[in-house]
């Protein structure tokens, strides 16, 4: 009877104070025999309830502090209100890829200049980058490691080499067994390169990780020596192993470490390297030996097609022209490798930079056109309106060791997406904006060069008025009395995210939120929004956290990101995790005994 009465009342206790709980329980046990039982039971409950209320208070305070942190505002370089975080460290990490790339450039001392559009203080340093990564790992270790695989994956992911190495080395110093399992289990060399393994082997401070990777390298080297002797295919390990007779002191030092690992003398190390590289038929080696006519153009890697395109014509003109002619005809026996490259590599190769604010186009280039045409079309890309930022700040360079600009990235993505849009209304059309939005139509352009020439006519390099763009979209449907269905289902905004402040500025509301209210006031729903960050400065200026129609936050330079753009998810974290599950699910199995599922 006592327990039944107590059970019927316990659900109401959560909202009561400690004294009220005590009185309530006194009623529950009034029929108990003896004061001793009553007293002991009451004291026990009071102690337990005190702990419960304290825990509840802490939980409430933590919830408040989390909400306060997530609601913290920041400001763009143009004084627009933004959010400092998306509310998820994993999403913040994924939205900061350009900044992470710059941090890695500094980390590995690869900077060639220190020209920053908004100043170096606005960029992310390596300490901040690693802190963000570790924060994400502590929140969700499994998905953070999936993200790391995605960051490196040359074909399915972002293709970021230095970011991956910096972060994997750091986490490897902290959790060496887990990282060793990650590298071996996911077969890093198949979605990255063998020099990733070598770099971490040389850089790690963990003896466990260093020794474990040493065994991996030594075993692969021995297998390749045997495979070469049998005439079989071998790995690309020797392509990236440093030579011991190079002019670089650092490389000679690293070669000495490998000699010791493999128990070889300097001569014994040099001889198999030369033989194995010859067996690989590496393009760079044949070029350095002036063996141009021995190069099979069908097997030339993506980047080498760009790097040597003029040299091929100069040193092997007849064969090269015949190869290009076969490509133009669509000869099935002839192919060009174009998968392992960034779209901006092709666009940038067409640009001739005359000054910081001025550039022109190089002459028509058949290789650039073929590389562009060979890019695989995205799947299910439909009903998405591209909005490309053409403001002055987009002329910022991606990193301090690159001449590529954020504008070249935006151009390449905008042209690629518009070209492959299955919706006839948006096919080969998109909006560019700066001081004012303009519609760009490239449907009459036959070549990539023609498209770039037309696009550059719309650049005005002034401010970043995204509000005017959505005003134009809204004004169009209102004036023409168009239904909601006439609007695109999604808008893809490719930008550095340094938006101007709203015309009616409010420190607590972002310009995008202002635009959404305008749509709602006039009876429309703002389309789903996809923000694609291409700038080193946007890591702490999140344009939006939630949106009724859905929001996706992406960054980076790979066309594989479009797979996430076409996602039907409405929440940025769910969209990212769905992408990671689709492309990096092997990590679930590889790390099942090494990390906890959040």
Name each model-derived stretch.
Residues 55-409, 419-598:
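Long lumenal/extracellular ectodomains of secretory and single-pass membrane proteins
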